[in-house]
Amino acid sequence: MIKAVVFDVDDTLYDQKAPFVAALAPIVQLPSSFDLTPTFQAYRRQSAQAYARVTSGSWSTTEMAVRRLNAALHAQDLPPVTPEAALAFQEAYVRELQHIKLFPGLAAALDRLKERYQLGIITNGHTDHQLAKVMRLKMHQWIDRDAILTSEEAGLAKPDPQIFTTMNRRLNLRASESVYVGDCYSMDVKAAKQAGWQAFWFNHRNLEIPDGDWIPDQTVENPAELQDLLLALTTLTKASF
């Protein structure tokens, strides 16, 4: 039986692409109609590796900002930017993140979920940075601070399944009693399944599963479907997912 519903943050609770594009478009000086989706997806794919290199000391935060952005631009055959431009993007991106909002329907679903389940968050990134997003999204209405686990706190980062085990100990629950909701197949779905959790894939970017080793327990493709899935959990007398 499911007793806890735990969420990823970036591009799961809110649309991460919108602030990314708003910050990057003026830097690369492309028409507003230009689709930067491949650059955004490449930027996200590098998140775990970039974070690991900073925490290990092999990259400075400045070096990460430059290398990560230029690698993402290269993935879309766009020219690299100068270090100054990369840092300007990073500053603009942080400003844009101050305006993030929950995906439509999530607040109503969280209201209902809180009545029946423990709620939590597992997120990669520096604790202060991720908690700032959580506060802007007003997630403290539904989730206690001790049920929010960052990779910096855990000393582990997704896709390491051990971060999910750490959360189980924090919530005093078994893996089989936990479900994780996330947008990234490798970081969220595969990692959660490897830890023995159920996994709900919020595949609103319409991505393909890169391998067939781990199948999500449920897949939804837009915020309305995610709301319906979460509300369905609140109507069950015994979890059947």
Q: What are the roles of these predicted feature ranges?
A:
Residues 86-99, 106-137, 148-151:
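Substrate-recognition element of Asp-dependent hydrolases with the DxDx(T/V) motif
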Residues 60, 100, 121, 179-180:
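Residue-level marker of alpha-helix boundaries and capping positions
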Residues 1-5, 111, 126-241:
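Asp-based, Mg2+/Mn2+-dependent phosphohydrolase catalytic module
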Residues 2-9, 13-104:
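N-terminal helical cap/lid subdomain that shapes the substrate entry/recognition surface
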Residues 34, 116-117, 174:
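Secondary-structure boundary/capping positions in well-ordered alpha/beta enzyme cores
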Residues 18-22, 104-108, 132, 161-162:
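Generic recognition of short, well-ordered alpha-helical segments
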